[in-house]
Amino acid sequence: MGNGEAYMHWIDWVILVIPVMLVIFTGWRTRKYIRGVSDYLSCGRLCGRYVLNMGDTANALSIIGLVAYVEMKYKTGFSLSFWGNALIPLTVVCSLTGYCLYRFRETKAMSLGQFLEIRYSRRIRVFGAALRSLAEMLANMIMPAVAARFFMQMLNLPTHFSLFGLVNVPMYDFLMILFLTIAISLLCFGGTLAIVITGTLQAMFLYPLTLMLICFILYKFSWSNEIMPTVMDRVAGESFINPYDISKLRDFNFFSMVIVVGFNVIFHTATWIGSGTSSAAKSAHEQKMASILGNWSLQLMNILYLLIAVCLITFLNHKDFAVEANGVRQTLSSRSAAEVISNPETLEKVQKTIAEAPPIYHEIGNPPLSQAENLDTAFLDRIHKTLTDDARERTERALVSQNGGKELTEAQLASSEVQSKFNYAQGEANDSFQQVRTLFNQLNLSVTMRHLLPTGLFGAFCLLLFLAMLSTDDCRIFSATLTLAQDVILPLFPKGLSPKKHIWMVRWVAIGIGVFFYFGSKYMSQMDYIQLFNQMAVAIWNAGCPAVMVLGLYWKKGTTKAAWATLLTGILLSVAYILIQRNWANYVYPFLTDHNMVESVGSALSAFSSPFGDWIKWEMDPVKFPINAFEFLFFANIFTILFYIVVSLITCKEDFNMDRMLHRGKYSEAGVPKPAKQSW
C-alpha cells in the first residue's frame, strides 16, 4: 500500500460508523432516567453482577491497554505468563473474601474521600482526593494521544487538513478533541448510568468482533513454520516461551511481573476503590460476584491480545515478511522522527537514513535475537548514530562561529567548557532518540495491522478499538471526575448543593478534566513504555496510599499524623524520581559526565541492586535511567508502609473505633437486616 492510498473501504466505514452512532444514541437516551444525584454518580446502586460484568468487560479492552500489552510481549515474550498464573490462587482468595471491598462498603462511603474523612480527617479527605485525582489524570492524560496517533497511523491520515480552505488544522489535535468530546458527552448525558449501559452495549459488539479477529490471525500465519520458529529465536536467558530461561530479561521480568504484581494484589486492592462503577452495585456481594465473573469473561480478550502480539512478533521478524516489515519500520520511524525532531536539518538527515535502510533477511537462529541486538535495534541504531553525529556537527559549527570562524585547536577541544557543550549536545540527541524509540515501539501495532487485514475485517478491527477507546476514556475521565467533584469541590459548599446544581458541577468538572487531558496529551513527552509511564505517573499517589488505605481499613492504631506523613513522603520520593527519569538523558547524565561521577554512581547502583541477582540490575545508560518505575514504586511502598507503622505507633494515643466506622455492634443501623446468603 502506498503512502497516499486510502485504507478504509466504504464497507469498513459502514461497519465502524453505525455501531458507534448507536452507542452514542443510547448514551443520550439515558438522560431521562437520571432522577437524582445517586442515579448520576452510582446508578442508584441498583446494578447486578451481569450488568457490571459486561460493562467492566468493555472498559477492560482499550487501545492504550492493547498497545501496552503488545509493547511488553514484543520485548519479553510469553514465558512470564507461566509465573503470573502462580498468582491466580491469591487473586481468587481476595475476590472470594471481598478483601477491602466488603470493608469499604461497610463504611457506607460513596467515594474515596468520604472514607478518608471517616477514618482520618476532613483535611486529609480533600488532600488525598485531590492527590489521587491528579495522579489518575497524569496517568490517563496520554490516552487521547495514544488513540490519535494509533488511528492516524492505522488509517494513514495526513498530519494536517484544510478546514473549509481557511485554516490548516493538525489532524493529531482534531482527533484528540473529537475523541474527548464524544467521551465527555456520554458522561454529561448520564454519568455512571451512561457508562454502564453503553459499556454493556459495547460488550455485545466486542465478543463477535474479537472472535472474528482470532480466527483470521490463526488462518493468516502458519503456527509450525512461521510463528513457533520466530518466537523460539531468542538467546539464552531471554526465552519467549521457556519460563525457566528468563534470567536476563529487563523492565518486564520476573521481579516486575510476578513479585511486584503479587505485592500489588495485597497492598493496592484499595488504591482506586470508590471509582468508576465500583459503587454502583446493589450490594457488596453483587460487586464481588461481578469481579469473579469478570475474570472468566475476559479470557476471550486475553486470547485476542496474545494472538495479536504473536502476529506482530512474527510479521516483523520472520524473513518471509522482511520487505513488508522494513516498510513498516520506515513508516513508523519516519513519522515518529517528524513528530519529535524540530530542527529541519537534523530531520532531513534522519529521514535520509531511514529511507536508505535495507530490508533485513534474518535466518532463524543465526544469530538468535536478544533485547540488545534484534532487527529493531539494528534499524534504530542507525537513527541514533545519525542524531549523535548531527549533534556533534552542529555543536562544532557553533563553536567555530564563536571562535571567529577559526577551527578549534586540540587544546580548545579538550577544555572542560567545550567538552561540557559536547556532553549536553549528546544528551539532547539521546533525549530525542529516546522519544523516537518510544513512539516506534508504541505504534508498530497500528501500521502492522493495516498491512494485514482485508476489507471488512479492517473495519471490524477499527470498530473494536474505537469502542474500546470510548469505553475506557469515559470510564477513566469519570473516575477522576467523581473523586475531584465529591471530595475536593463539594466540601467547599458547607450547605451542600441542590441535586440539579450538584449534577451540573460534576459535568463541568468532567469537561475541565477533558481539557486537562487534551493539553497533557499535546505537550507531555512520553519517554518509556506505556506501563512504565503509568507506574511513574501514579506514583505521587501510589507511593504512599497502600498504608493509608489498607491499614486504614484493617488496623485500629493508624493515625491521621501517620497518614499525612506517609502521603507527603510518597510525594517527595515520586517527584524526585519523575524529575530524574524525565531529564536523565539531556541533563542528569551529562551533569554526571561533566563532574566525573558516572563511574561512582554506577558502582553505587550496582552495589544496591547486586543482592537481587538477575532480578534487578541497575547499570548506567546514557539514554535511559537505570531504575525503572516498577522497581522504584515497589521500594517506595515498602518504605512508606514501614514509615506509616512507625509513626502510628509513636503518635497513637487511643485506638480508632473500627466498629463505628464499619457500622458494627452497637453502631449497626436499627431495622437493617443482615444480608441474606445468596446462592452461587
Residues covered by each model-derived region:
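Membrane-embedded helix-loop-helix hairpins and adjacent transmembrane boundary segments
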Residues: 1-680
